[in-house]
From Swiss-Prot:
This is RxLR effector protein CRE12. The RxLR-dEER motif acts to carry the protein into the host cell cytoplasm through binding to cell surface phosphatidylinositol-3-phosphate. It comes from Phytophthora infestans (strain T30-4) (Potato late blight agent). It comes from the Eukaryota. Effector that is involved in host plant infection. Contributes to virulence during the early infection stage, by inhibiting plant defense responses induced by both PAMP-triggered immunity (PTI) and effector-triggered immunity (ETI). Induction: Expression is induced during host plant infection. A motif (RxLR-dEER) lies at residues 40-59. Residues 1-23 form the signal peptide. Keywords: Secreted, Signal, Virulence. It is found in: Secreted; Host cell. The lineage of its organism: Eukaryota, Sar, Stramenopiles, Oomycota, Peronosporales. GO terms for cellular component: extracellular region; host cell. Belongs to the RxLR effector family. Its main location: secreted.
Length: 165
């Protein structure tokens, strides 16, 4: 299929620039010198060969100029940018609310009364290791010196409680 199309195009390029489209042009070439094969080869050499300037098949259409002409593309881009900034603002708001809630919850652990009457005894009942307590606070988004101090105090509390035998 491709070969037939290529041959048809090659014949068209050989005949059309010549300007002699007639039955005589399609017939065997007439030459006074040489044989039939030589005349045919001379005629094929006369066909201009295209200059190869790289891989022509991989060229793509550039739509950048069309985007400048079509109305509404810049408005669409602006709307998309606005939506993205609104999403980012909502995420920041949610993160701030979550941080405020965690900070409010963590305030109770600053009180010795809460630690020794509620938190430490419940952790002992659950048989939580100090590392698990640290992981618990980390899962809720708290870490640092305050958490380290609570974990150390819990470890001391756990070691000073008499164990039941």
């Amino acid at each position: 299929m491709r070969l037939a199309a290529f041959v048809l195009v090659a014949v068209a390029f050989a005949i059309i620039p010549d300007g002699r489209v007639s039955a005589a042009a399609l017939g065997p070439p007439e030459s006074s010198e040489g044989t039939h094969e030589k005349a045919r080869l001379l005629r094929l050499n006369a066909v201009p060969q295209p200059v190869e300037t790289g891989n022509q098949e991989e060229r793509t259409i550039n739509f950048a100029s069309i985007k400048k002409i079509v109305p509404g593309t810049s408005a669409f881009k602006n709307a998309q940018a606005l939506k993205a900034s609104q999403k980012a603002a909502l995420k920041a708001q949610d993160a701030a609310k979550r941080k405020a809630a965690v900070d409010k919850w963590f305030k109770q652990f600053e009180s010795d009364e809460f630690l020794f009457t509620a938190a430490f005894p419940s952790w002992v009942r659950k048989k939580m290791h100090p590392d698990k307590v640290r992981e618990y606070f980390a899962s809720l988004g708290k870490s640092g010196d305050d958490v380290s101090m609570i974990v150390k105090r819990y470890d001391n509390y756990r070691q000073t409680i008499p164990t039941k035998k």
